[in-house]
Amino acid sequence: QKIVVNDAGVMYIVCQSNTNGIVEISPEEGGTFLGYFGTNYASVSLQTIIYRAILTDEQRAKMVSNMPSTPDNLSIDTKGLIYTVTRGDENMSLKRLNIAGTNLIKGGVSDYDESPAAVTTGNHDNIYVASSQGYIYEYNKQGELLYVFGGTDDGTQRVGLSTQVTSIQVDSK
């Protein structure tokens, strides 16, 4: 679905319906699978925990399994840090991953109700997240919301509004 490449030629690929994380492929020998990177975790509500504690094994087997969400988009900055956005992951929809796959944004980002569609970074380490509804959210590198702009175009084709966002990029200035 989405792919970024670091300075060493290592590819990071978001694969549809893959719950193991981002696929990491080395350029060695025509492409060597290195493993998975930046895995999302499945969140479980208190209600689900209580249900599972009181249900029989047969009833639990019929419950929907709790699988982690697949990232929807990713980006890489000049330092090699990987950024991902994931729909349906309330507290960790935006991640800033180091080389070990550890999220550097502590506490998660939950400043918006929209579905994140794309992510990129700017020259000052700011992070830009575009929602599928046309809003652009700008965060600092710690994941603190700086401001929101844009919106959904209602057919009037006004400047700064979008009907559906699929990617985002910022210029070098």
Language model features with spans:
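Conserved beta-propeller blade signature
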Residues: V10-I13, L81-T84, N126-V129, Y137, ...
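Short loop/turn segments that connect beta-strands within beta-propeller blades
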Residues: S26-G30, L97-T102, N140-E144
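Residue-level detector of Asp-centered blade-edge/turn motifs that repeat once per structural unit
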Residues: V5-A8, I76-K79, T121-H124, V170-S172
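Surface-exposed loop and turn segments in beta-propeller and other repeat-based domains
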Residues: Q1, G30-M67, T102-Y112, L146-G160
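Structural signal for beta-propeller blades
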Residues: T19-I22, G31, N91-L94, Y135-Y137
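Short loop/turn segments immediately following the C-termini of beta-strands
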Residues: A8, Q16-N18, P27, K79, ...
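Beta-rich catalytic cores
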Residues: D7, N18, T70, E90, ...
